[in-house]
Amino acid sequence: MRVRIGLTLLLCAVLLSLASASSDEEGSQDESLDSKTTLTSDESVKDHTTAGRVVAGQIFLDSEESELESSIQEEEDSLKSQEGESVTEDISFLESPNPENKDYEEPKKVRKPALTAIEGTAHGEPCHFPFLFLDKEYDECTSDGREDGRLWCATTYDYKADEKWGFCETEEEAAKRRQMQEAEMMYQTGMKILNGSNKKSQKREAYRYLQKAASMNHTKALERVSYALLFGDYLPQNIQAAREMFEKLTEEGSPKGQTALGFLYASGLGVNSSQAKALVYYTFGALGGNLIAHMVLGYRYWAGIGVLQSCESALTHYRLVANHVASDISLTGGSVVQRIRLPDEVENPGMNSGMLEEDLIQYYQFLAEKGDVQAQVGLGQLHLHGGRGVEQNHQRAFDYFNLAANAGNSHAMAFLGKMYSEGSDIVPQSNETALHYFKKAADMGNPVGQSGLGMAYLYGRGVQVNYDLALKYFQKAAEQGWVDGQLQLGSMYYNGIGVKRDYKQALKYFNLASQGGHILAFYNLAQMHASGTGVMRSCHTAVELFKNVCERGRWSERLMTAYNSYKDGDYNAAVIQYLLLAEQGYEVAQSNAAFILDQREASIVGENETYPRALLHWNRAASQGYTVARIKLGDYHFYGFGTDVDYETAFIHYRLASEQQHSAQAMFNLGYMHEKGLGIKQDIHLAKRFYDMAAEASPDAQVPVFLALCKLGVVYFLQYIRETNIRDMFTQLDMDQLLGPEWDLYLMTIIALLLGTVIAYRQRQHQDMPAPRPPGPRPAPPQQEGPPEQQPPQ
């Protein structure tokens, strides 16, 4: 009985297994008919140890296979093709060949380009582009077999890994992708025109392309166009439109947009001023890596603007920016930027601003064409570095240096060597040619050539590395005062290259190079003071040096752009650019922005806000040591511009300008306040003292001081009269005791002598006058021509 029951159970189990196998086979056939690209289950991907990753449509593998090409095994010439078999079964056959098949040969490995799927989606819509799978084109993708319902289709197939998969894109995503491709093309076209031409008409055309790209939400184009609208660069100035773009960029996480929005809130342009919001946006911009935001935060922490003053925080921000600036320094040097102060230019019209007049430039060009070597070298340097009203132009610099070098000028040879050593679009980089020019210049004793030759031996450019020769040439250049030689000597002593490490010698040569204005010398000194290497650590000194380096970055070129805008009469564009640079800590920009606001030349600032904003920037410029700004602060408090009248505060600012900068104007003002008793007790003697000090401090103050002293004498006399009783003075006066008992006779004699002298002088004057001549006959009146008189009838 038990045996029968066991057999019955066994028979039932066999029947159930057969029924299950039949249903699985039918399901597999149905699935194969629905889609030939569907995997039977998600386990086929999950079970692989070398599963790949798909990010934004790009394929990333964790295996050792190449990203660009994958080695796949070629299919056999004929695959078993039966109507009920699925693609998965074919793949399984190829992945696991029958070991018992003796005729089976290992497939040969071939190289095929890896196709990449375009974008991705998880929405489940069918894709609308043909894709390749097993060398066949298909028009559909499917989400079958995926728990997340995401579309997938194979773009290439790896028979070992079975895991290279791409995602299809929807029609909407495809349209967006095509739009972004068009926007990128517009952006690249605009940037090519913008960087390749100096003509304003072509730059305006470039911004038309950038505007089209910006309208398609191209991030970089939006950044360019928004700043152009803010500054009025080749586009009409529109602060509101710029603000809207900055807000859009900020929502997308653009550091440039965040920094610009912080600037608008800090300056109150297009929005209500809010230093708190400005600080937030500046912080986000800095976290995103924007260097201008780091500069702004560095200055704010250094000066304590809106935050607690912190030297270490300022050092962190400034050092980060200085690292970028120092790494961007080239051998030939960047463009030269003049820091022109508008108040000084107005107060002293004859002052040399450093800008060359067009007539003078043309005169030098005329001399250079006539063969004047000095003019050729001078123009070459002007065009190499730019500045002083001359645009940077390496082609012209190369041509002028060539002319002078052919004439035997060592300076021109050395600069040609620098241009070849650095390389550019105009001059191809060539160590051999650079070495040739450096040697010729060094043999003639030129320090620039000696320094260049030292660089060649130091870094092995065209020659074998030789530290002894490098040290020799750097010393020769440094002895002649060439800053590059001094800098490199300092670096060799600092790092112990070719010499024994000596921080004192390094500090000495870095100081010498910094006196010549070398940016890297400032940078190296800042590093030494920040770390306390060779010197006592000084955060304050390090911050000041790093700040100096940061202000030599490429963004400093906007100082000249703002100055040119001011000279062209575009005061709104000038003041906005100066305000942005003022936020970065440029003292020149702070004083110039305050000056434009003080003159009420910018219409974008309301009349009620002009003086308060000017006062703010005068204050920041004064804290950086600008004398005129300190005197302006005294004037604003004296007259009540942008603040209440406060004579005591005005007196403090004048005294600071007098003691720290020895300003004659401040001394004169202190004398006046002592004379009038404004903000301090009246003291005529101290007033005279300050007037005298002003006359000694400046020859220009002598005439005003003389007039002030005359007035002071009258004031002193009147004050003496008020304090003295005149009647009592004459009553107490004893003439007999003062002049003697016969003082009246002396007085009468003196009066008689004076009268006699006057009478004699008048008589002599009368005798010297010539006698009057008798009047001559009167001339006859001119005859009038007319008709003859008619005789009366008789």
Curated annotation (Swiss-Prot):
Tissue occurrence: Highly expressed in pancreas.
Residue span of region Interaction with ERLEC1, OS9 and SYVN1: 22-737
Domain Fibronectin type-II: 122-170
Membrane-spanning segments: 739-759
Impact upon substituting M528R: In NEDGSAF; likely pathogenic; results in impaired function in ERAD pathway and decreased degradation of endogenous and model ERAD substrates; decreased SEL1L and SYVN1 protein abundance
Membrane topology of the entry: Single-pass type I membrane protein
Entry keyword set: Disease variant, Disulfide bond, Endoplasmic reticulum, Glycoprotein, Host-virus interaction, Intellectual disability, Membrane, Notch signaling pathway, Phosphoprotein, Repeat, Signal, Transmembrane, Transmembrane helix
Main location: endoplasmic reticulum
Residues carrying sugar: N195, N217, N272, N431, N608
Biased composition (Pro residues): 771-794
Chain intervals for the UniProt region annotation (Mediates retention in the endoplasmic reticulum): 738-794
Residues spanning the signal sequence: 1-21
Cysteine-cysteine disulfides: C127-C153, C141-C168
Binding partners and assembly: Homodimer and homooligomer. May form a complex with ERLEC1, HSPA5, OS9, and SYVN1. Interacts with FOXRED2 and EDEM1. Interacts with LPL. Interacts with LMF1; may stabilize the complex formed by LPL and LMF1 and thereby promote the export of LPL dimers. Component of the HRD1 complex, which comprises at least SYNV1/HRD1, DERL1/2, FAM8A1, HERPUD1/HERP, OS9, SEL1L and UBE2J1. SYNV1 assembles with SEL1L and FAM8A1 through its transmembrane domains, but interaction with its cytoplasmic domain is required to confer stability to FAM8A1 and enhance recruitment of HERPUD1.
Disease field: Neurodevelopmental disorder with poor growth, absent speech, progressive ataxia, and dysmorphic facies: A severe, autosomal recessive disorder with onset in infancy and characterized by developmental delay, absent speech, intellectual disability, short stature, microcephaly, facial dysmorphism, hypotonia, and/or ataxia.
Family, similarity comment: Belongs to the sel-1 family.
Entry protein name: Protein sel-1 homolog 1
Organism: Homo sapiens
Species classification: Eukaryota, Metazoa, Chordata, Craniata, Vertebrata
